[in-house]
Amino acid sequence: MKNGKRVYLFIILLILISAATYIYVTMFMPSSKRVDHSTYYGVKDKQVAIIYNDGLQKASAIEQDKEVYLPYDWAVAILNDKLFWDSEENLLVYTLPEEIIYMDENYISDGKKAFIKSDNSAYVSASLIKKYTNVNLRSFTDSDIRKIYIYDNSVSLVSARLKKKSKLRSGETIKADIVADLDKEESVYILGSSVTDGDLTGKNKKWLKAYTDKGDWGYVKVSALENMDYVVNISEFVKPTYTSISFGEPVVLGWHQVSNMDANKNMESLVARTSGMNVISPTWFSLSDNEGNYTSYASRDYVTKAHEMGLQVWGLVDNLSKKVSTVKLLKKSSVRKLLIEKLINDAITYNLDGINLDFEGLNAEGA
């Protein structure tokens, strides 16, 4: 009988030990599994993972000739909307306040091609992006898994040092897979929203998102860190100022239908029947093809008389001709450039105060 009780107690003890072991392993024992880096970063071959501020992006870049090239669509949507890709003429166009830069496939910026093409998509040089955008970047392209870190200069970046050996993990838990081993006194950089004002030390958090000097990215335990301090971003970027002209008062505009030169003679009698108008817009210019040409009924004498009557003259440009596809016209940088130059020349020739673009039927593709 006593032997039976002993066996029973032994079995109960084994069950308790097994349960305790299971609970410990499940809840408290750190994972020793390591991530597959290609799967973790979502890249392979010459693709480059993009970490922007503190987030891994779905889009990936390309490395070529020791330069990282960012996908145009992503760069414009996230970093700089002043860039324009002309797929018709394979030109990258950048608009500055006082000039427009046209970059073809041979255009070199800081020793690098401004863009490359892959699978019919455009990729923009990261160095070019940095030159014209208020960001800092750091790329790691010597390892099998390539990465580029891009962060706005307005985003906090904090450096820290490991006070003991630790692990960089794929999530905010010891059960998350290991991304990299961290050595004592190794430096890490804490990104973006992981650091908030008044919480430099991470005292309100157990884990912080960070990357290492080797380019690894993941989560590190706050308890393993010391010597946390803000990194001072040094950038030569000067944000351009895009100015505009204000009329200074409400615009009261009247259109004047002009379909031939003789119609210009009616301006004075038509204006006499109006009240409070300060701008007249004669329909002088009409696009005639997809190459930037247009018909013109402009008159210097008309403008002189209008000015004497206290009116500004804004020549109207329309796209009503059935021969014109405005989408095709606007897609080509050379045509847009020609059209702009011709309109400016006519504005100077006829002493116009402005140009009134009346392009109808534009959809999102042509906008």
Regions found by a protein language model. Name each.
Residues D73, A77, S127-K131, A180-K184, ...:
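Solvent-exposed, polar/charged alpha-helical surfaces in well-ordered, non-transmembrane soluble domains
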Residues V195-A210:
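Short, Lys/Arg- and Gly-enriched loop/turn segments at beta-strand edges
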Residues L168-G171, D197-L200, N260-M267, S288-E291:
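Short, solvent-exposed loop/turn elements at domain surfaces
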Residues K165, K221-E268:
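Boundary/entry segment of secreted carbohydrate-active catalytic domains
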Residues I234-K239, M261-S269, Y297-Y302, L338-N345:
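Alpha-helical scaffolding within the catalytic cores
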Residues E185, K206-T212, V220:
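SH3/SH3-like beta-barrel fold
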Residues E249-H256, S286-A367:
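Chitinase-like catalytic core of GlcNAc-active glycosidases
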Residues K2-S194, E226-N227, I234-Y242, S246:
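Primary recognition of N-terminal secretory signal peptides and signal-anchoring hydrophobic helices
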